[in-house]
């Protein structure tokens, strides 16, 4: 690379990733094959439209690539329809929502501070700006979704669309119960599995594909693919809906809402990376990987509990969990900074019914996908949890420096994918 300044920055990031324990639940490490696809000549090709229906010439090869990604996504999730063009999970949600309902309609999604996502109705997101947004949360006692409460809220506000999914909820979601509620109030159901897609694809969590009208996801996180979005449909794919004042099947409405509705040309190099990731996820080794992710996550959560810390909802069913730091007398923001100083990366996170501002927060979110991609096992994960507790409890800067060197020595023994 001729640009030495940029090259040095990339090398610094590579070094940071090698020498850090990565616990951000939404991050992962892609394979070298995915990186090769994303860094390929496909970045040169503009391909507005869809396979065999492009607005540019010279698209025969990228048509085959997109069709390959679509077929692999459908096989992986048991779907009848897939759109692999969304640039992100948020854009996948935007297209899915706008294909099902119109601006001003009512949305019912999970409260952001209880584990939801910005695109599920937050006032700072398009979903809260252009739609009449309502929210459900978790029970104060169990810190889990109370489906009877969701039903009562739905009956009270009569939403046009219910969104099931989360970004910091550690329990498996019952999508069938959400569909029952949606049917009772004549609402569409959108399931967002951005965080748990890998668990759904491998059968560790129940699948919403034939339950929801539409399912959205990211292609990174637990799928270990490139950063991007995905929209899927099962048996509802050919349901007739009113889109833009025209009767259309749901799959065609979604296609129109992705392009030209919310995006221009697709990123063909990223779609190629998605195709690689879908193939990798279809292998038995990937199911074994997800099993280890769940095992490592549970091991860390159980260790924190054994050390007297409180885990939101008392445990985890997936790849992440939230730690309430109130007992240690520090905030999530404090913990994030302390841990970054010892080469452990995670994020501050609000806990349900948090009294602190989200920019400060009472908790931290911990996820195991990235460390599992580096080969850490259950015992290694417990050691990671031990590093965290040592760092958060010490008042000594010398001890923090010592922990940092231990962390670097420990994690550097595990290869990057």
UniProtKB/Swiss-Prot annotation:
Keyword Amino-acid biosynthesis applies: yes
Residues flagged as site, Plays an important role in substrate specificity: 220
Subcellular location(s) per record: Cytoplasm
Catalytic activities: (6R)-5,10-methylene-5,6,7,8-tetrahydrofolate + glycine + H2O = (6S)-5,6,7,8-tetrahydrofolate + L-serine
N6-(pyridoxal phosphate)lysine sites (modified residues): 221
Entry keywords, A to Z: Amino-acid biosynthesis, Cytoplasm, One-carbon metabolism, Pyridoxal phosphate, Transferase
Binding site for (6S)-5,6,7,8-tetrahydrofolate: 112, 116-118, 247
CDD domains linked to this entry: SHMT
EC numbers for this chain: 2.1.2.1
Disulphide bonds in the chain: none
InterPro entries in the record: PyrdxlP-dep_Trfase, PyrdxlP-dep_Trfase_major, PyrdxlP-dep_Trfase_small, Ser_HO-MeTrfase, Ser_HO-MeTrfase-like, Ser_HO-MeTrfase_PLP_BS, SHMT-like_dom
GO terms, biological process: glycine biosynthetic process from serine; tetrahydrofolate interconversion
Cellular component per GO, a single term: cytosol
PANTHER family assigned to the protein according to its UniProt record, in alphabetical order: SERINE HYDROXYMETHYLTRANSFERASE, SERINE HYDROXYMETHYLTRANSFERASE 1
Function in brief: Catalyzes the reversible interconversion of serine and glycine with tetrahydrofolate (THF) serving as the one-carbon carrier. This reaction serves as the major source of one-carbon groups required for the biosynthesis of purines, thymidylate, methionine, and other important biomolecules. Also exhibits THF-independent aldolase activity toward beta-hydroxyamino acids, producing glycine and aldehydes, via a retro-aldol mechanism.
Protein name from the UniProt record: Serine hydroxymethyltransferase
